[in-house]
UniProtKB/Swiss-Prot annotation:
Species annotation: Cryptococcus neoformans var. neoformans serotype D (strain JEC21 / ATCC MYA-565) (Filobasidiella neoformans)
PANTHER family linked to this entry: SERINE/ARGININE REPETITIVE MATRIX 2 (PTHR36562), SERINE_ARGININE REPETITIVE MATRIX 2 (PTHR36562:SF5)
Keywords: Coiled coil, Cytoplasm, mRNA processing, mRNA splicing, Nucleus, Spliceosome
Primary residence: cytoplasm
One Pfam family, short name: cwf21
Annotated protein name in UniProt: Pre-mRNA-splicing factor CWC21
Annotated family: Belongs to the CWC21 family.
One GO process term, biological-process aspect: mRNA processing
Gene: CWC21
Length: 205
C-alpha cells in the first residue's frame, strides 16, 4: 500500500501488491513514432502500406570475399592433409596452387552455400528470377500495384488509352471490310467481263 492506495497485503490477490497506472483510457497515438500524424489520414496510411517491399541487393564485394575465403579453407585442408603424409613443401605448394586454380575456375565445386545474409540474398535473387521467367512476369512489374489506389489522372489516362485502342480496332475493322468489298467488286467485274468475252466467242463460232 502506498499513500493509502492499494492492497494491504498481496496475499490471495494474484498481484504483486504494487499500484500501476491504468492506461486503458488513453487514446492510441496516431501516425508513426514521434507523434507526427499521417498526411491526410487514412488515405495516406493506405498509400504508405501499399508501397512494394524493398529488396536489398547482395553486396558483390562481400560475396567475392566469401568465395575466396571458402577456396582458401579448402586449400588449407589439403595442405594439412599433405603435411600429415610427409610430402615436400614444393610439392605441397604445387598441389595447393592447382586446387586453388581449379576452385577459382569452377566455384560450384565448393559445395553448399553460404549462410550469411548476402549469400542468402543472392540465392533468393536467383530463385525469384527463375520464378519470374517461369510465370512470365514482366520486368517492369510493380509489386503491390493491384492494391494501389488509382488517382483521377491515372484513371482518366487509362480510360483514354482504352478508348484509343477501341477506336483503332473499329477503324481497322472498317478498313478490312472496305478492302474485302473492293476485292469482291473487282472479282465480280472480272467475272462479268470473262462471261461477256465467252459469250462473244460462242456467237462468232
Amino acid at each position: 500500500m502506498y499513500g493509502n492506495v492499494g492492497l494491504a497485503t498481496a496475499r490471495g490477490s494474484g498481484t504483486n501488491g504494487y499500484v500501476t497506472r491504468n492506461t486503458a483510457h488513453l487514446r492510441i497515438r496516431e501516425g508513426p513514432p514521434g507523434g507526427q500524424p499521417y498526411g491526410s489520414g487514412y488515405d495516406a496510411l493506405l498509400e504508405s502500406v501499399s508501397k512494394p517491399p524493398i529488396h536489398r541487393a547482395p553486396d558483390q564485394g562481400i560475396l567475392e570475399h566469401e568465395r575466396k575465403r571458402r577456396v582458401e579453407v579448402k586449400v588449407m585442408e589439403l595442405r594439412d592433409e599433405l603435411e600429415e603424409k610427409g610430402m615436400e613443401e614444393d610439392d605441397i605448394e604445387e598441389e595447393c596452387s592447382k586446387l586453388r586454380q581449379k576452385l577459382t575456375a569452377q566455384p560450384e565445386q565448393l559445395g553448399g552455400r553460404g549462410l550469411d545474409t548476402h549469400s542468402l540474398a543472392a540465392a533468393k535473387e536467383i530463385e525469384m528470377s527463375r520464378l519470374q521467367r517461369a510465370l512470365g512476369v514482366s520486368v517492369n512489374h510493380e509489386e503491390g500495384r493491384a492494391f494501389k489506389r488509382e488517382t483521377e489522372e491515372e484513371k482518366a489516362a487509362r480510360l483514354a488509352k482504352r478508348e484509343e485502342r477501341e477506336r483503332e480496332r473499329i477503324e481497322a475493322a472498317i478498313t478490312r471490310e472496305r478492302e474485302n468489298e473492293k476485292r469482291k467488286q473487282e472479282w465480280e467485274e472480272k467475272e462479268r467481263l470473262r462471261r461477256r468475252e465467252e459469250y462473244k466467242r460462242r456467237r462468232r463460232d
